[in-house]
Amino acid sequence: MDIDGEDVSRRLHVKFVTKLDSPFKVPVNSVAIPSNVTRLGLSSIVNSIIESENPEWKTEPFDFLIDGELIRMSLEEFLLAKGISAERTLEIEYIRAVTPRKEEEPSLHDDWVSAVNGSSPRFILTGCYDGLGRVWSSAGSCSHILEGHSGAISSVALVNSNDAETVTVATASKDRTLRLFKFDPAESVDSTTKVRAYKILRGHKASVQSVSAQKSGNMVCSSSWDCTINLWNTNESTSEGESVSVKKRKGNNQAEESQSEGEAVTSLVGHTQCVSSVVWPEHDVIYSSSWDHSVRRWDVETGKDSLNLFCGKALNTVDVGGESSALIAAGGSDPILRVWDPRKPGTSAPVFQFSSHSSWISACKWHKSSWFHLLSASYDGKIMLWDLRTAWPLSVIDTHNDKVLSADWWKGESVVSGGADSNLRISSGIAIS
């Protein structure tokens, strides 16, 4: 088969292969295509071949790999850059493009949306500068309001497992406290239920910036402008160091209940400036980022840091994922998303640096089921989807009209984000191969 193009003087013979199921497969035949074709041109060719076999086919964006590396330039430029011979028949693998196929209607808040969490497939959590946490069952549908903070919420975390009937959520706030809430996601369908915290966690001496839940257990960790990381129990029963408030209240759609206060079980000390972000991916390991330009890995049992990475910039966010959940991504006060691989001995330099943003990075998140994919959010108003196999973003989500303050994956195929435009945005239909 010969595919027409502007440059008829130079043709390359290729075979398109895929691991996708029908109807995405094309016949494994050699076709001749122009050497100056780009990714968009390759996508058009594959769509034309599929449409010739299936007239009802709807155009689908594709990405393309040669020897496991994504193509982000013309085919001829790619072959020259990689030293690949153009004389042989090239095998080009195609996958569904990692890009949103649908934008949901925005969910407006009363102030900046400073935190989002998509850990549960049943709902989305948001935290807002109005001091309220919110639970969204879908775009525009707020099922629960988590109330009680006197300052802006900076972070939200899902504490217990996704399949639990009653959900536990932790919120962190600029009022120096954390609050723990319990609610049933299925109980509120036609109205919004207000939920009061069952426990208030006090101990930080400055604004709390981040909260993360232990992957398996009943604890959360928090980070603060007071340069510390605190660990807390989330159980309802009181123990030494906890005091019970006898105050009870019954509000709108709210059951009467008591409220306890908790103190930190322990503190991790070592950072010298604001600890901007924490994640707790393993039972005994916590990672943190700080304005002191460092990323640290903490041993929960000893309370000491076992890894200390410096990048020369104040950091706002950190996450752990990728191959064997061993890669560390962080971003901060420059436009560069950095990725480290601490398994490589003798080096503390990032193994990847992605620099397509034009302002500070506010959030980064690894995809839970992919070794290659992660996202970043920035004050430039954009969210970028990345693949470690190319230096360019796979997709740029540009739906916010102000700074993006938070972002996360949801259900594996959506990105949820919040920003200074006071909106929760949902970008869905993202195909992760």
UniProtKB/Swiss-Prot annotation:
GO biological process: maturation of 5.8S rRNA from tricistronic rRNA transcript (SSU-rRNA, 5.8S rRNA, LSU-rRNA); maturation of LSU-rRNA from tricistronic rRNA transcript (SSU-rRNA, 5.8S rRNA, LSU-rRNA)
UniProt keyword annotations, A-Z: Acetylation, Nucleus, Repeat, Ribosome biogenesis, rRNA processing, WD repeat
InterPro entries: G-protein_beta_WD-40_rep (IPR020472), NLE (IPR012972), WD40/YVTN_repeat-like_dom_sf (IPR015943), WD40_repeat_CS (IPR019775), WD40_repeat_dom_sf (IPR036322), WD40_rpt (IPR001680), WDR12/Ytm1 (IPR028599)
Subcellular localization: Nucleus, Nucleolus; Nucleus, Nucleoplasm
PANTHER family referenced in this protein's UniProt entry, alphabetically: RIBOSOME BIOGENESIS PROTEIN WDR12 (PTHR19855:SF11), WD40 REPEAT PROTEIN 12, 37 (PTHR19855)
Function: Required for maturation of ribosomal RNAs and formation of the large ribosomal subunit.
Natural source organism: Arabidopsis thaliana
Residue numbers bearing the N-acetylmethionine modification: 1
Gene expressing this chain: WDR12
Cellular component annotations (GO), alphabetically ordered: Cul4-RING E3 ubiquitin ligase complex; nucleolus; nucleoplasm; plasmodesma; preribosome, large subunit precursor
Primary site of residence: nucleus
Family per similarity comment: Belongs to the WD repeat WDR12/YTM1 family.
Recorded GO MF terms: ribonucleoprotein complex binding
Region (Ubiquitin-like (UBL) domain): 12-96
Protein name, UniProt field: Ribosome biogenesis protein WDR12 homolog
Location of region: Disordered: 238-263
UniProt repeat feature WD, residue ranges: 108-146, 148-191, 203-242, 270-308, 310-350, 356-396, 399-433
